């Protein structure tokens, strides 16, 4: 059972905080923009709302942030009114927001000067996964702090993955999102093309699910060839270009 300050109890942060409470952790929370329903529910579960970071509790094991951008994360950590100015505890700080890796690294370096260790641990998957406690959590930072935090993080995520040194969690999240977003766009365009071409959509989906188009080159072509250092052409660029022009 850990003593935790959770900063940011919005769409994702609220269910994440709730799962920590359900797993018997002691929780204080801070969010001046939280909706009244979330505040009321958290209080009913025994959480304490702090009105200012000046009132940061003593004897914390973890401080967790789940905020919209790096600007807000910096403000509540290393800003003029951030936690670094109001505590002497040697807690582990965990940022679960999706922010620039350079911001994660900068915050980590500044906190380290004050004796505070940091993990960047952005989450993947959907709001329902946050509710169910089945998020994917991608962690960057020192391995020792990761090991100390894993059991607590597993209250919020079914898959907790150590990605490497400071900033690695943020980098992996952005890389994953980059591929996921592009694949989503391509999928929508492909199905729209099938519709406009008069091809039955169910047929197109069934067919493409058996090829690299649906299964993904990451699962087929790359393990079979590229990851084995075999980069010999399997399909000429000129032929690929010809097909795209059709």
Where does each model-flagged region fall?
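NAD(P)+-binding Rossmann beta1-loop-alpha1 motif at the extreme N-terminus of oxidoreductases
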Residues: 1-58, 62-65, 91
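Rossmann-fold dinucleotide-binding core
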Residues: 4, 99-178
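Rossmann-fold NAD(P) dinucleotide-binding segment
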Residues: 53-118
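Mid-domain beta-loop-alpha active-site segment that forms a flexible
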Residues: 167-193, 236-243
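Interdomain hinge/lid region at the active-site interface
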Residues: 170, 217-246
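Small-residue-rich helix-loop
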Residues: 199-212
């Amino acid at each position: 059972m850990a003593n935790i300050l959770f900063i940011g109890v919005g769409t994702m942060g609220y269910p994440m905080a709730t799962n920590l409470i359900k797993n018997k952790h002691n929780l204080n929370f801070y969010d001046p923009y939280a909706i009244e329903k979330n505040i009321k529910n958290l209080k009913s579960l025994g959480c304490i709302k702090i009105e200012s970071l000046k009132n940061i509790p003593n004897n914390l094991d973890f401080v967790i942030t789940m905020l919209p951008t790096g600007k807000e994360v910096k403000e509540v950590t290393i800003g003029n009114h951030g936690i670094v100015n109001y505590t002497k505890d040697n807690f582990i700080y965990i940022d679960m927001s999706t922010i620039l890796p350079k911001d994660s690294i900068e915050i980590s370096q500044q906190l380290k000067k004050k004796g505070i260790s940091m993990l960047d641990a952005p989450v993947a998957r959907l709001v329902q996964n946050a509710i169910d406690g089945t998020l994917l959590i991608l962690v960057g930072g020192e391995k020792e702090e990761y090991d100390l935090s894993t059991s607590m993080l597993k209250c919020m995520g079914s898959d907790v993955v150590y990605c490497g040194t400071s900033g690695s969690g943020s980098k992996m999240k952005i890389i994953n999102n980059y591929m996921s977003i592009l694949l989503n766009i391509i999928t929508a365009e492909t199905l729209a093309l099938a519709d406009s071409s008069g091809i039955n959509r169910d047929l197109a989906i069934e067919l493409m699910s058996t090829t690299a188009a649906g299964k993904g080159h990451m699962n087929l072509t790359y393990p079979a060839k590229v990851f084995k250092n075999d980069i010999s052409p399997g399909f000429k660029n000129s032929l690929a270009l010809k097909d795209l022009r059709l």
